[in-house]
């Protein structure tokens, strides 16, 4: 622990030694779970920075510590920067939120079913345009935005929320077209300089690499991450796109959090009108009933508190920005690893700073009827047992007891080297008897008959396998068959996807990803040789068979 800057009082209250110890304990627990090599956090109120803490290492090999000057990539928190710049142009009368994007980018084109209204700036800001998330298949924005013309849409603009990085890339091109300068210059002039964020860099380039903490990823990119997984330096890349290409420090980011706490007012006057900030923080309901997405801001209700902010992820970095307007407190967490949850940690620090005593981590409850013994129905594996324990659910296999981490409802990670290529997915049969899937292998409850599975067609058997690309954002995925139902499985799901999703055939030979008929993400396969597809196109970007 390196404590570089500390002020013990704020707003008439005191962060005592117990409060600081609680914050350090919360960080230590988060780092033990996710194992980022280094982390920094900042706490602020509307008037100034209250606390900066740094932990761990900016670079493991040399054991270089994180300092208050260390830069971290903040990922999609950059979307909040982009939204502020767009709304400034709205305040200036230079952008109409409800005008079609083509009004500002004449070459912008997205196939729309007949009768659908055009996509507007507001749709892009709120992730309701109905377009794909984007696979980041190129290092720049223009070609990815251009390529939207080759991808179908299945829902009308404004109809549903679907997170889209490429939508914010398009907003960056709109900013450049209207403001007449590169994105980095727009952000520096409109946000960084007025907020006195002089250490922040609005583009990730080789020129700043020496100031950046080294990003770390898991050594095995085709396995689910867990606390014992080895780390390796993440792929380095340059980027300057409006969905996330900013590097900053905890001190500088506290200045940006204050902009949120002050409703759009900076240290020397308003950056956003009250009306613009109200629009920014008025959310569109998303996939989580306790959360809503505004214009570059996520509003989330957690345990009786209303938080606003955004998370961010880059190749080798994670970030979390949370503000509690009612408590007049905000926190930024930056880390150079992709484990743990910086958004959750930021909320915990706010609670501690506001006088709450941190509670114990909730123990994942296992639904009663999921516990029991299971046998593989393909005669290719050993039986296993799922059981509840005081520390949460466990898997017992081959004389070992393995802790299960909940990824989603009825979806668990077994943190060892035997089961970490796929999650454990509990599914229910028609008579409500659970069965357990691990990739394409089914485990049946002991004493229960194995239900017959439909035989997959030759066409489906051809697509099953492991696919890769050299794209550092989404390096690989697998297709497995569960009877005649194909499933798409990621070790680390990209934006717009889940860890596991079923695939549904479409009339044109492609597959829709997931059960939502309005989901724009599609997958299709070609180049079948010796009964194996050699190439898969994931929402427009190629991946190649690797098994």
Report residues per predicted region.
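Peripheral terminal and inter-domain segments
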Residues: 2, 343-547
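Solvent-exposed, non-membrane alpha-helical residues enriched in polar/charged side chains
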Residues: 24, 28, 32, 87, ...
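Active-site SXXK
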Residues: 24-27, 41, 47, 70-98, ...
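Short, surface-exposed loop or secondary-structure junction motifs
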Residues: 48-60, 112-321, 325
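Short, conserved catalytic-motif segment at the N-terminal edge
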Residues: 14-74, 94-96, 103, 109-111, ...
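Short, well-ordered beta-strand elements
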Residues: 309, 320-337, 434-438, 534-538
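A generic structural motif
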Residues: 56-58, 337, 493, 540
